Amino acid sequence: MSVDFSSERVCYVHCSFCTTILAVSVPYASLFTLVTVRCGHCTNLLSLNIGVSLHQTSAPPIHQDLQPHRQHTTSLVTRKDCASSSRSTNNLSENIDREAPRMPPIRPPEKRQRVPSAYNRFIKEEIQRIKACNPEISHREAFSTAAKNWAHFPHIHFGLKLDGNKKGKQLDQSVAGQKSNGYY
């Protein structure tokens, strides 16, 4: 996959939380709009206006010390500024260390583990039951049998019980001709 560099600009952004250098590729059409970037290392969200930053960082001559432009807790350096000398990156990291205290990154909420569905619980228990009765059956065959058992027993879907329940017995008898020993 090739990237057309004539339609976009690659810039380097320092994360204000973990000081990781991020390569940001921005289309020229979006240069003067506010861009949000997420750090892949610490998941910190960085908001910056790359067009304004590029204009301000490219104005001074290359031989002068690099003065990073700060926009919403980020610093931006263009490719030619980073490549000009190792001294400029050292000055940049020193300036970041001297700045105001850092705010903690905005982290997404943790995902809660969901309770397994009735279908998943039934299939798991049914596979275990089938394999206990016939240990030589493959997992694939046991799953297929368990899925058929789920499909052909409507009382399972609705949570009806067979113990003394007249309706449950009627439902069980309606599929009795299709099964042997209660299971496929």
Curated annotation (Swiss-Prot):
Pfam families: YABBY, YABBY_N. A zinc finger (C4-type) spans 15-42. Gene3D superfamilies: High mobility group box domain (1.10.30.10). One of its GO terms (cellular component) is nucleus. PANTHER family: AXIAL REGULATOR YABBY 2-RELATED, PROTEIN YABBY 6-RELATED. Interacts with SPL/NZZ and SPEAR2. This is Putative axial regulator YABBY 2. It comes from Arabidopsis thaliana.
